[in-house]
Amino acid sequence: MQKKNLIVFDIDDTLTKSENQHQAAYVNTMIDFGITEINQDWKSYPNVTDSHILKLNYEANFNKEFNLSFIPDFERRMTERMLALNKTEEIKGASKIVDFFMNETDYAICFATGSLLAPVLIKLEQANINFVPELVETSNTIFTREEIVKSAIEKAKTYFQVTKFKSIISVGDGIWDLKTAKNLGIHFL
């Protein structure tokens, strides 16, 4: 079926019950790397993404500029920590909803999250959420949610060979998801 519309899904606590595991692995990984003074008031950050929060805390702790080349080592350690925690479960019905829209409607699906890629793939796999890796956008190289969502939309256009989607709906659970959709002029659920 030709895809004419798009749903952009957030992942943590939208499709997967993973926010607690994510935060534990994330904060403990920062500590592993010597980032011990951590502002955990996530809503206070201008960009609620792993890369942006890591950047600001890194710079505050080490008094030097953050470089994205730090992300791969951080991501590896965070992934190890995620795998040591309880398995991620789906939000009830999430996998059925994703499958329904992908297989039975003219809605394409993509994923946009402020998390880092490797932990996200683990969460989706553990929760048995069907996904195409090329349709997952994360914060590995992008600091803002708006840019993450825009990149996910572009990936979906390429993957589904669509020049422009008639309607785009962002689905998320955080106030930052709502703000992002509003800033981009797309629908929000």
Report each predicted region and the residues it spans.
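Alpha-helix termini
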Residues: 62, 104, 154-163
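Substrate-recognition element of Asp-dependent hydrolases with the DxDx(T/V) motif
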Residues: 94, 98-125, 135-143
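Conserved H-loop
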Residues: 36, 130-134, 162
